[in-house]
């Protein structure tokens, strides 16, 4: 459990710093009285669920573009720990399992990402 926590903290650090490098201005997201606010303006989260581990990395751009074409502005992803830690203490965030790369790809298309780290995932996943 301690190793998972450390890995999770490292992962979020990578995601935060990768986003900070690509974005030059700070954004402010908050809950208003009756709506979410992004930079002080009303914001509706229109989210699509994508499972990056089920999509070959070469198709990430295409799937994200399809979500955007449907009017989505956010991608929700689960972190499937049994993919990233198939052997206790050995973590794999490379290739198709590269969460930071997936988040950067979404950002490249102007999409936001909501990351849900689990351990429970409601995605028919073993």
Role assignments for model-derived ranges:
Residues 32-54:
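Boundary/entry segment of secreted carbohydrate-active catalytic domains
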Residues 17-22:
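Sec/Tat signal peptide C-region and signal peptidase I cleavage site
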Residues 7-16:
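Bacterial N-terminal signal peptides
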Residues 60-126:
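Aromatic-lined substrate-binding rim segments of carbohydrate-active enzymes
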Residues 30, 37-40, 69, 108:
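Extracellular/periplasmic catalytic domains that process cell-envelope and extracellular macromolecules
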Residues 1-5:
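Positively charged n-region of N-terminal signal peptides that target proteins for export
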Residues 23-35:
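Short acidic, Pro/Gly- and aromatic-enriched capping/linker segments at domain boundaries
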Residues 26, 53, 89-92:
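A generic secondary-structure micro-motif detector
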């Amino acid at each position: 459990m301690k190793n998972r926590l450390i890995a999770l903290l490292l992962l979020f650090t990578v995601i935060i710093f990768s986003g900070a490098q690509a974005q030059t201005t700070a954004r402010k997201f908050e809950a208003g009285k009756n709506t979410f606010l992004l930079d002080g303006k009303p914001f509706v989260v229109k989210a699509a669920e994508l499972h990056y581990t089920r999509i070959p990395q070469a198709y990430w751009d295409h799937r994200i573009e399809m979500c955007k074409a449907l009017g989505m502005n956010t991608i929700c992803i689960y972190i499937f720990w049994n993919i990233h830690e198939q052997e206790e203490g050995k973590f794999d965030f490379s290739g198709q399992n590269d969460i930071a790369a997936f988040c950067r790809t979404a950002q490249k298309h102007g999409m936001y990402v909501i990351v849900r780290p689990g351990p429970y995932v409601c995605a028919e996943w073993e």
